[in-house]
């Protein structure tokens, strides 16, 4: 996109030093990045598509062209890019780790690592006076200077011991890890500059309104963990893992949680009764069960948060819900004292979200490992889902509150099959295909959350029993082709010849909210892939194909390509599909007739926008010599 750019500089340093033979080793791995970018303004592509081609880029006097009376309120996209070209950010990041490794005797190892990830971002965003036809900011000039800082550090200490006695082989591991993250940001804003250049436009040079913002937060995580692996004759395999994590995002009552896991394996081909099957190289049964935790919520989720909200007014109803109060009786004169508004209700009892997963699988290879593959079934259940619930009205202001409530399950199969060999004329090949299924279901949620649309259902129906993010909508049942069809249909506000007909599901003679049904499922019936590797003499070719079958997508593009009334703004550029819109001379079209107003509410969620998202694409192709 014109007047945007992106530059990145990277430097890397790695080193390892053996101080005492193989007993003591130290090392470090660090990377330094510098990124500088001018990003495209938000929505610039949409603006360029929307603005009518009849509006020139430049007016006859050389100034920027723009809409005039009666034309839509869209800015000149070329002017937007010009005024955006100085809005640059610079981002520095240094990350890496240093370690000490101690091997006191055979099989025993202790390693301690300290990791650091520090980032700093500086940016300035300029507002220049502009006049583009009727679009103007009335000579306003301003700048916002922003600083953002992120600091993450990690320290761990891990001890391992390996031992092998005859057919018995095993290893144990124990360790702990500390993590800390701190983020802060602040910005200064100033208006009215006498010189409109980036070198001059710093907040101190402005003479108008000044504002400052800033905040900071962080969290800590401590983990203790251990693992034991054991195998007998490489035939029977056992692995046990236990970890305990504590996060500052949770209250003292539930800050820590324990997550165990176990896995078992049986390599059947190592049994004596399988020795005669020489064509079977490897056959392994495996099963595992384990738990993991999730703490990805706001750092302030457990706190009750109060904030001043001075002089805020509802832009629609005009009702003031600000926190200013005339304590002194000045009848509104001057600046009033401000109280505080509760923005979040605290909950010191929120705890870790837990996922319990069970896997059962089989791995195999045959004919000197030419034919190989695996089959696996998994079942995953997530409980104590962390979610925000709207505050109860009797508690007063407060909005949302973080809670643990709800459960969700995921299950599916994964199958992988490959074949590799070499032909008589020297072509080496390896073909590997995979297919997987995945089903998801919301098992339980609080009633207010299940029906508010956050997990799916569009706020119309409870999503419990359905797929996460599945949607409810109307069933588009073709186009009204005659007045007789309109008259014989259920009462539908806005119904007319050439308009979309919606199905009366409950047969009550009225198209209303009760006629919505589950119409969108974002999970595919199955997904698949194919890896191809070919090698001949000094040439090699690699390809990766990926496909998804039986998945729904919602095409929001249709709201612009199929409706003249999109965004309720006339005179915007439209999609060429409208050239095939319904008309008396084009009665078989599936695109509704042209109209300047959406009286039939055809932009409502409906099957008209739901399409089959199945695809097969070539993800990667590489030829080497």
Where in this protein do the model-derived segments appear?
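Short glycine/threonine-rich loop-to-helix capping motif typified by GTGT followed
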Residues: 252-257
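Transmembrane beta-strand segments that form the barrel wall of outer-membrane beta-barrel proteins
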Residues: 1, 238-247, 289
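Glycine-rich, aromatic-lined ligand/substrate-binding cores of catalytic
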Residues: 521-556
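Residues on the lipid-exposed face of transmembrane beta-strands in outer-membrane beta-barrel proteins
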Residues: 13-17, 96-102, 157-161, 174, ...
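Active-site and NAD+-binding cores of ADP-ribose-processing enzymes
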Residues: 618
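P-loop NTPase catalytic cores that bind/hydrolyze ATP
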Residues: 108-110, 114, 434-436, 530, ...
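Short, contiguous hydrophobic alpha-helices characteristic of membrane insertion segments
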Residues: 224-242
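Surface-exposed loop/interface segments of Gram-negative outer-membrane beta-barrel transport/assembly proteins
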Residues: 2, 10, 14-93, 113-222, ...
């Amino acid at each position: 996109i014109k007047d945007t750019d992106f530059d990145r500089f990277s430097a890397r340093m790695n080193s390892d030093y053996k101080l005492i033979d193989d007993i003591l080793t130290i090392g470090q791995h660090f990377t330094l990045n510098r990124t500088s970018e001018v990003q495209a303004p938000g929505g610039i592509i949409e603006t360029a598509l929307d603005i009518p081609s009849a509006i020139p880029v430049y007016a006859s006097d050389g100034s920027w062209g723009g809409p005039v009376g009666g034309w839509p309120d869209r800015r000149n996209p070329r002017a937007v890019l010009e005024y955006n070209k100085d809005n640059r950010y610079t981002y520095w990041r240094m990350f890496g780790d240093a370690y000490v490794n101690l091997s006191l005797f055979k099989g025993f190892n202790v390693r301690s690592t300290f990791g650091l990830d520090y980032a700093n971002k500086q940016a300035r965003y300029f507002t220049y006076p502009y006049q583009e036809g009727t679009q103007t900011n009335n000579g306003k000039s301003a700048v916002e200077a922003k600083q953002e800082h992120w600091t993450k550090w990690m320290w761990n200490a891990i001890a391992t011991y390996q031992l092998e006695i005859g057919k018995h082989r095993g290893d144990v591991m124990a360790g702990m890890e500390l993590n800390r993250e701190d983020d802060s940001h602040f910005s200064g804003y100033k208006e009215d500059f006498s010189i409109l250049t980036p070198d001059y436009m710093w907040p101190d040079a402005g003479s108008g309104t000044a504002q400052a913002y800033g905040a900071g937060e962080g969290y800590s995580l401590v983990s203790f963990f251990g693992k034991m692996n054991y195998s007998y004759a490489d035939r029977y395999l056992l692995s046990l893992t236990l970890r305990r994590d504590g996060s500052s995002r949770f209250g003292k009552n539930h800050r820590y949680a324990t997550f165990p896991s176990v896995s078992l394996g049986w390599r059947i081909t190592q049994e004596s009764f399988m020795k005669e099957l020489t064509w079977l190289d490897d056959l392994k049964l495996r099963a595992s069960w384990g738990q993991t935790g999730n703490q990805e919520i706001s750092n302030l989720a457990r706190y009750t948060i109060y904030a001043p909200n001075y002089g805020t007014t509802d832009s629609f109803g005009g009702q003031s819900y600000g926190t200013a109060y005339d304590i002194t009786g000045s009848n509104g004169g001057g600046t009033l004292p401000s109280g505080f508004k509760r923005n979040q209700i605290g909950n010191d009892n929120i705890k870790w979200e837990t996922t319990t997963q069970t896997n059962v699988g089989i791995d195999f290879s045959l004919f000197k490992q030419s034919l190989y593959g695996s089959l696996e079934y998994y079942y995953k259940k997530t409980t104590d889902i962390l979610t925000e619930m709207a505050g109860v009205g009797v508690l007063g202001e407060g909005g949302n509150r973080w809670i643990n409530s709800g459960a969700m399950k995921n299950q599916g199969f994964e199958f992988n099959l490959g074949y590799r060999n070499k032909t008589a004329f020297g072509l080496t090949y390896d073909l590997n295909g995979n297919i997987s299924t995945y089903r998801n279901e919301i098992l339980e949620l609080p009633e207010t959350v299940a029906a508010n649309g956050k997990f799916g259902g569009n706020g119309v129906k409870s999503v419990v029993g359905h797929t996460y993010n599945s949607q409810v909508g109307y069933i588009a049942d073709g186009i009204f082709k005659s007045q007789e069809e309109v008259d014989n249909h259920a009462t539908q506000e806005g119904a007319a010849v050439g308009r979309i007909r919606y199905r009366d599901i409950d047969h009550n003679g009225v198209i209303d909210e009760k006629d919505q049904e589950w119409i969108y499922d974002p999970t595919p019936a199955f997904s698949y892939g194919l890896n191809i590797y070919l090698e001949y003499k000094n040439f090699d070719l690699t390809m990766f194909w990926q496909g998804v079958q039986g998945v729904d997508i919602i095409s929001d593009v249709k709201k612009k390509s199929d409706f003249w009334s999109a965004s309720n703004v006339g005179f915007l550029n439209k999609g060429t599909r409208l050239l095939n819109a319904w008309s008396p001379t084009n009665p078989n079209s599936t695109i509704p007739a042209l109209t300047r107003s959406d009286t039939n509410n055809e932009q409502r969620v409906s099957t008209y926008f739901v399409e089959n998202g199945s695809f097969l694409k070539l993800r990667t192709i590489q030829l080497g010599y």
